[in-house]
């Protein structure tokens, strides 16, 4: 399955690939091989980047689900966070270009905060990117829990898609957007949450339980 967020880009990649294939027929053998190989690479890379496999969200109460595919690169405690007006735990997930980049809702509830912030394009694995890069901020309040998370663009990723806005009712595990071509998601929640992941662990959006409360 290909995400609707990538259909325009996929169409552009298809056109470029067709042009390259057409050129390969009139070029010398070695040049033809290079150009046709490039056409195949562009098409295959675009297809794999915008893939959007179905996910089975655990049917379990009081869980927080990973909003992103990737690798946990940071877990830390913060003394204060504006959204919570108190201490929080933070988990940062780095998404490489080979990961699925569609993001999913971590808890069911109501969206109470949304903000788009323009910024820099530091490497997404640089922890300073969470405060300095282009990003969106989303806050969700559920029945017994609230979370705050950021979609953060990276050095390559320069297009954030986020479909939720304040007042929206959202469901755990459902798609809400994506970040194109390498990026990061930071998620924050109260310190009372029991962590279920560790640094270096891989996560799957919509499936991996990162916390329980």
Curated annotation (Swiss-Prot):
Site (Cleavage (non-hydrolytic)): 182-183
Active site: 183 (schiff-base intermediate with substrate)
Position of the signal peptide: none
Gene Ontology MF: a single term: phosphatidylserine decarboxylase activity
Alphabetical UniProt keywords: Cell membrane, Decarboxylase, Lipid biosynthesis, Lipid metabolism, Lyase, Membrane, Phospholipid biosynthesis, Phospholipid metabolism, Pyruvate, Zymogen
Any one of the GO CC terms: plasma membrane
Pathway, per record: Phospholipid metabolism; phosphatidylethanolamine biosynthesis; phosphatidylethanolamine from CDP-diacylglycerol: step 2/2
Cofactor binding notes: Binds 1 pyruvoyl group covalently per subunit.
Enzyme Commission number(s): 4.1.1.65
Cofactor: pyruvate
Family in the record: Belongs to the phosphatidylserine decarboxylase family. PSD-A subfamily.
Protein name as catalogued: Phosphatidylserine decarboxylase proenzyme
Organism: Chloroherpeton thalassium (strain ATCC 35110 / GB-78)
């Amino acid at each position: 399955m290909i995400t609707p967020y990538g259909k325009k880009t996929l169409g552009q990649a298809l056109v470029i690939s067709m042009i390259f294939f057409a050129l390969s027929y009139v070029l010398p053998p070695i040049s033809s091989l290079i150009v046709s190989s490039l056409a195949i690479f562009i098409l295959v890379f675009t297809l794999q980047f915008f893939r959007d496999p179905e996910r089975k969200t655990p049917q379990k109460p009081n869980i927080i689900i990973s909003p992103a595919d990737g690798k946990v690169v940071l877990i830390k405690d913060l003394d204060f966070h504006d959204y919570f007006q108190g201490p929080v735990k933070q988990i940062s997930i780095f998404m490489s270009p080979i990961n699925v980049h569609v993001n999913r809702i971590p808890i069911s509830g109501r969206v109470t905060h949304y903000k788009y912030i323009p910024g820099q394009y530091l490497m997404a694995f640089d922890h300073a990117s969470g405060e300095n890069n282009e990003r969106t901020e989303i806050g969700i309040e559920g029945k017994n829990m609230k979370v705050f998370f950021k979609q953060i663009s990276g050095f390559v990723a320069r297009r954030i898609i986020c479909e939720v806005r304040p007042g929206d009712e959202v469901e755990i595990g459902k798609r809400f957007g994506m970040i194109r071509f390498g990026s990061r998601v930071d998620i924050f929640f109260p310190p009372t949450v029991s962590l279920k992941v560790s640094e270096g662990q891989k996560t799957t959006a919509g499936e991996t339980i990162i916390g329980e409360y």
